Design a protein with these regions (language model features):
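Amphipathic, charged alpha-helical segments and their helix-to-coil junctions
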Residues: 27-64, 83-84, 88-120
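Bacterial N-terminal signal peptides that target proteins for export
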Residues: 1-10
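Short, well-ordered alpha-helical segments
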Residues: 66-81
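Short amphipathic alpha-helical segments, especially helix-boundary/capping motifs
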Residues: 10, 52-55, 69-72
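N-terminal signal peptide c-region/cleavage motif recognized by signal peptidases
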Residues: 19-22
């Protein structure tokens, strides 16, 4: 499979995951918690394709929502990697570059490969 095809498949899958909150017990509530935290600058998107905490979190519900979303993304990246003969890490990075970064709203944070949080 070509890199372009892999990117297209991964982009569609990640987009669906971001919209549905796949594998979450209460996707709407978890997505709402994470979206609010992203708006406040508490949670951001990392270069590896996972959510991360820009600021230390004390809210157990938010921590659980981030962990659940990241678990869903990890499963997606493993599946995409197996189908496309790449590592899950490469799939996560590709998802960030092709889908996640483009969906960041102004004011939201993302983490660079060097580890710095940057406000969009």
């Amino acid at each position: 499979m070509t890199g372009k095809t892999f990117t297209a498949i991964l982009a569609g899958a990640v987009g669906a995951l971001m919209l549905t909150g796949a594998a979450l017990a209460d996707p709407a509530q978890s997505k709402a918690l994470v979206d609010a935290a992203k708006s406040r600058g508490d949670v951001g998107e990392q270069y590896d394709g996972y959510l991360g905490f820009v600021k230390p979190a004390s809210d157990a519900a938010l921590k659980a929502a981030v962990a659940e979303i990241n678990a869903g993304r990890a499963q997606l990246y493993r599946e995409a990697a197996a189908r496309n003969n790449v590592t899950p890490e490469a799939a996560g990075i590709s998802a960030f570059k092709t889908v996640v970064q483009a969906k960041l709203a102004p004011g939201e944070y993302y983490k660079t490969p060097e580890g710095a949080w940057v406000k969009k």
